[in-house]
Structure formats: structure tokens, C-alpha cells
Amino acid sequence: MAAKLRKGDKVVVLAGRDKGKEGTIASVDPKAGKAVVDGVNMAIRHTRQTQTSQGGRLPKALPIDLSNLALLDSNGKATRVGFREEDGKKVRFAKTTGETV
């Protein structure tokens, strides 16, 4: 199946402790059905000090399930994504506004 959410998409979290937060997708893992969203699902990772890095407690964005994310349309509202053909190419569009993504 084609990817409805891709890297660089602006999304909103639908469920979980970060419900309502918005962010941009940094990476997508289609096999696992998860995506890393900037500023969402953050966890503290402890790193040891080395010659090159300071070390300490660093925040890291963890993967979140794709089913808990929704694309934001041009109005800033959560929308579902559909597919249609334009000029012989398969394109994604927002179901709320009908605009191509």
C-alpha cells in the first residue's frame, strides 16, 4: 500500500500522552508502521561523556505508531488522506479540503 504519511509532513497526534501536539515527521519506518515526529514522544537518554561529546541527559524523539497520527490540512485541522490520479500520476489529497498534499 502507498504511504499516506511521509517524511516532512506536518501532523497532529490523535492519541496517547502527547495528544494534540503538532510536529513534522523526521523519519518513517513502513515495516514497523511507525514514524519519528519532532518534539513528540520524547524520552531522556543518558549518554556517557567522551572526548568529542559532553554527555549527560539528552532528549530523544521515539517512534510513534502511524495510526496515532493525522495529517494537517491547509486550515490546520486533522484530515484523512486519499489518493487520486492527476495527469497520469498518483497523488495524495486531503479529504477535508480536497487539495493535493
UniProtKB/Swiss-Prot annotation:
UniProt-listed Gene3D superfamilies: 2.30.30.30
Keywords annotated in UniProt: Ribonucleoprotein, Ribosomal protein, RNA-binding, rRNA-binding
Biological processes per GO annotation: translation
GO terms assigned for molecular function: rRNA binding; structural constituent of ribosome
Keyword Cytoplasm: no
UniProt keyword Ribosomal protein present: yes
Residues spanning the membrane: none
PROSITE patterns per UniProt: RIBOSOMAL_L24
GO cellular component: ribonucleoprotein complex; ribosome
InterPro entries the UniProt entry points to: KOW (IPR005824), Rib_uL2_dom2 (IPR014722), Ribosomal_uL24 (IPR003256), Ribosomal_uL24_CS (IPR005825), Ribosomal_uL24_KOW (IPR041988), Translation_prot_SH3-like_sf (IPR008991)
Function in brief: One of two assembly initiator proteins, it binds directly to the 5'-end of the 23S rRNA, where it nucleates assembly of the 50S subunit.
Family in the record: Belongs to the universal ribosomal protein uL24 family.
Subunit structure: Part of the 50S ribosomal subunit.
Name of this chain's protein: Large ribosomal subunit protein uL24
